Amino acid sequence: NAPDLEEIYALDVDPARPDHYLFEGTSIPLQQEIVQVAYKNGAGVSTESREFWRTPLGPVIYRDNGKVYIVRAAADGDYRGGEQFLRMMRATSLAEWKDAMRMRARVTSSFTYADRAGNIFYLWNGSAPAFPHPSGGDTSAVPAHRTADVWTHYVPFDSLPHLLIPPGGYIHNENS
């Protein structure tokens, strides 16, 4: 699988305020974060500071020529992967296991479920964005001026590739 799990968007800089971008006709400030990291430097410890910028849509990856480029990535900031695995392991039925999978905290992976009741279920559980536009791929940014230009949700869970109780009675998978 090679799903498209992220998109690069080009936002217009507010010409009157260089640390703001224009979205939905409003000037919105970029969020600045200074990160300090201590590291070993010979016998001592040094500290290095870096400045990062972000928007609610995703982190800024580049700024130039009146544009702010951001990357919007599936599951960015979602740290519930461990919780999802725990819920999967504790599931006592296919319905409970599917509920755990609906968390979509695992960005991409194939999963197999089987139980004593004879259920065998295969699922590619990707957090694939439902793009409202053709993807820019890895080579071009998609212009974003309003919410309708930006992906805001994933492809529905029940639309993901899956197979329940295969006709042959088993599943062979070398991708999990």
Label every PLM stretch briefly.
Residues 1-176:
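Mature extracytoplasmic enzyme cores
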